[in-house]
């Protein structure tokens, strides 16, 4: 499987690892990367499998949360990246935080924006929930059935987003970015460009549906790594995110990390990286 990634800035610079979410790709970081490289950082920004310029599996059954974790971890190991500052967004958090849990010695600090690592918590009942909830979730989506584009943009964003993406014949990647990110028509076409037709969009189609698929593994990442984390960890969410709905449970999960600090970015919506290009180190200092 071929993974496309950007490698910008001085090769001896401090490493910034930027990981996109759904349905974006590394093009999301086009405004942030020049700011970072101008300050001497080396920026690595991959496209996950099924997105951007990376290889794309045509069957939704070939995609899993663990597959994405494995591919991103393999990339970091092959590039032998160390002392990394990771900035993860949306699904980049669910994947990236699991990668960090598998290779914690390679990371020095983390910024998580409009994302979380969803887990049930400790205790017997919560352990039971981690096994049952994925099935309840799938049953709920099946019972509710497909959502139209109009339903998706009309409200109840998270549930309707999953129903739309899971059942859409041809998910409108550029349209999603334009709706949630207020991008121009030219930028809309740029986001859509890596996908000549619906066959190439299986990764984007199934990604939201996979969100609760590995709650148990997420929980073990907290217990084994993140509850013992002693390095800087910043939660940098926006105050106007229609996708997550600024769900306090998402922040509560990350607050299990002892060093976690939280700031709120005023104004931008879900794709906050389209509007701001701060230095991760500056964010950490704040």
Where in the sequence are the language-model features?
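Conserved HGGG/HGGXW glycine-rich cap/lid loop of the alpha/beta-hydrolase fold
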Residues: 8-53
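Adenine-nucleotide cofactor-binding loop residues
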Residues: 49, 269, 281
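Glycine-/small-residue-rich active-site loops that bind phosphorylated ligands and cofactors
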Residues: 24, 241-242, 271
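Alpha-helical and His/Cys-centered functional microenvironments
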Residues: 24, 93, 274
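Flexible "cap/lid" subdomain of the alpha/beta-hydrolase fold that forms the substrate-access gate
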Residues: 2-3, 8, 15, 28, ...
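Catalytic histidine-centered segment of alpha/beta-hydrolase-like enzymes
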Residues: 268-274
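Conserved small/polar residues in nucleotide/adenosyl-binding loops
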Residues: 275-280
